[in-house]
Amino acid sequence: MKALHFGAGNIGRGFIGKLLADAGIQLTFADVNQVVLDALNARHSYQVHVVGETEQVDTVSGVNAVSSIGDDVVDLIAQVDLVTTAVGPVVLERIAPAIAKGLVKRKEQGNESPLNIIACENMVRGTTQLKGHVMNALPEDAKAWVEEHVGFVDSAVDRIVPPSASATNDPLEVTVETFSEWIVDKTQFKGALPNIPGMELTDNLMAFVERKLFTLNTGHAITAYLGKLAGHQTIRDAILDEKIRAVVKGAMEESGAVLIKRYGFDADKHAAYIQKILGRFENPYLKDDVERVGRQPLRKLSAGDRLIKPLLGTLEYGLPHKNLIEGIAAAMHFRSEDDPQAQELAALIADKGPQAALAQISGLDANSEVVSEAVTAYKAMQ
């Protein structure tokens, strides 16, 4: 089996690329970073530090790389069985024209073996969005052929891969946590379902997308925002602060009650999942900075994201949300010199006041009880 993976950054090398290569798949990375491309093509291998209770070093081998903006990547799309991405939500639109060109070439070459494309991004139904961009870039006469022969498979991914400086200045070395989860929608594949260890197949992807968003992402963000307010440097420092831990755990339990109601998750299993996530935040090997995790507060306070979406669920089912409100209030206090969204948030609050600002960012009704609760909590933190 041959695969092409867009994005040779830390997540590409440390998570998806590693799973594909470990499964014995012939893997080529596509990227724009020439230093990384040259290193991959010179060595065809790299090291991954897997850290949890213990630390181990795995070697990923048999890989090579091409530029994501040249002809090589178009040629590969015409030949491979699987295309994956870990480029970040914004970049999906930029790689779509190259994918479209490759699909046209595949059609011209008469290659009708199934191709599946999986975007592995921190977003909901990212592959469906990528498909829209690809379809827009395709000529009309290729669209029906692509619909017939190419699967666009949505997925949910979860592995913490913080940026970390290599002790040896190796551009390929990467550190990842032990935990990883890659769940894909098995109803969207063309041809036989792949057997890749570490890839889980489901016919109810949205349940798992929301489980991750409402637990890992919600908890991570609230830990960061409360941690920053309390003067902590890392996620580990913050979650070991008992006051912060109580709010974070409480918020994940509140969002969890929504998931249990909505999708029928088992309550005991979900409680264990929350404990596992708290353990991940405590990982001493992951020097995850609260400022990095908290960045882009406007996006994180938007209606479909990790703070407001679970809050809306608690309103839908009439469930408690005190700790989620604390997290939202802390997010409104997030300030960072290096983050344009943090500066925009501060300016908006200074200009309109917290009530109107939160309503504008989140889509919540300015006169609602929850906005009033959040503003009260926000003022109590000043």
From Swiss-Prot:
<feature type="modified residue" description="N6-acetyllysine">
    <location>
        <position position="269"/>
    </location>
</feature>
<keyword id="KW-0520">NAD</keyword>
<dbReference type="InterPro" id="IPR013131">
    <property type="entry name" value="Mannitol_DH_N"/>
</dbReference>
<dbReference type="Pfam" id="PF01232">
    <property type="entry name" value="Mannitol_dh"/>
</dbReference>
<comment type="similarity">
    <text>Belongs to the mannitol dehydrogenase family.</text>
</comment>
<dbReference type="GO" id="GO:0008926">
    <property type="term" value="F:mannitol-1-phosphate 5-dehydrogenase activity"/>
</dbReference>
<dbReference type="InterPro" id="IPR013118">
    <property type="entry name" value="Mannitol_DH_C"/>
</dbReference>
<dbReference type="InterPro" id="IPR023028">
    <property type="entry name" value="Mannitol_1_phos_5_DH"/>
</dbReference>
<keyword id="KW-0560">Oxidoreductase</keyword>
<keyword id="KW-0007">Acetylation</keyword>
<dbReference type="InterPro" id="IPR000669">
    <property type="entry name" value="Mannitol_DH"/>
</dbReference>
<protein>
    <recommendedName>
        <fullName>Mannitol-1-phosphate 5-dehydrogenase</fullName>
        <ecNumber>1.1.1.17</ecNumber>
    </recommendedName>
</protein>
<dbReference type="InterPro" id="IPR036291">
    <property type="entry name" value="NAD(P)-bd_dom_sf"/>
</dbReference>
<dbReference type="InterPro" id="IPR008927">
    <property type="entry name" value="6-PGluconate_DH-like_C_sf"/>
</dbReference>
<dbReference type="InterPro" id="IPR023027">
    <property type="entry name" value="Mannitol_DH_CS"/>
</dbReference>
<dbReference type="Pfam" id="PF08125">
    <property type="entry name" value="Mannitol_dh_C"/>
</dbReference>
<feature type="binding site">
    <location>
        <begin position="3"/>
        <end position="14"/>
    </location>
    <ligand>
        <name>NAD(+)</name>
    </ligand>
</feature>
<dbReference type="InterPro" id="IPR013328">
    <property type="entry name" value="6PGD_dom2"/>
</dbReference>
<dbReference type="GO" id="GO:0005829">
    <property type="term" value="C:cytosol"/>
</dbReference>
<dbReference type="GO" id="GO:0019592">
    <property type="term" value="P:mannitol catabolic process"/>
</dbReference>
